[in-house]
Amino acid sequence: MLKYTIFFILAYLPVNADETKMLAMIDYITRNSKYEYKDQTLPTVAIKTTEQMCKDLFLDEVPDPCHIAGYFEHEANRIFIADKPLESMNDEGFYDSVLIHELVHFLQYINGEYEKVSCRRELERDAFNLQDDYIDDFNLSEKLHNDPLFAMMASMCDMFDDWGAGGG
């Protein structure tokens, strides 16, 4: 029982995300996008299993398969990153690649983009593009690139989209 309790505690502890790294990534994003940063409180970063993130995000029914590498929880100003890369991703650079993507969402939120989009999925377009640019510019593994078809589909609103504007 103690082993499981310790795992539970460790699984939800904030990671000591290097503030310098986060600020450097934010600088990269602001130089390569319309988003601005004016010393707002940085989000905390925590590690979770993909399974737990899927349960958190899909309260009713978790899709099978469920492939989530991370997400930004704007209400609590928190970023969650998977404890290990998805099958299609490379170990090396995984954390940075997900962190830059979620920091784009952080900047979208503080810049009011959540209120401007037709649905939350529209927010993914910039996040995927900036993430892929970062991967290229910092010579991270090409295996970290987003699949173009997936990125396009994940960025499109449809008539069944119940996320609405307001971000996530």
Functional labels for PLM-detected ranges:
Residues 58-92:
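Active-site scaffold of zinc-dependent metalloenzymes
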Residues 118-152:
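Post-HExxH zinc-binding segment in Zn-dependent metallohydrolases
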Residues 9-65, 69, 168:
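A metal-dependent hydrolase signature that marks the N-terminal structural subdomain at the beginning
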Residues 151-168:
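Short, low-complexity, Pro/Ser/Thr/Gly-rich segments in the mature regions of secreted, periplasmic
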Residues 1-7:
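Sec-dependent signal peptide recognition
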Residues 82-89, 107-117:
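Substrate-binding clefts and substrate-entry loops adjacent to catalytic sites
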Residues 97-110:
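Active-site recognition of the HExxH zinc-binding catalytic motif
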Residues 19-20, 89-98, 117-125:
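Soluble non-cytosolic domains of exported or imported proteins
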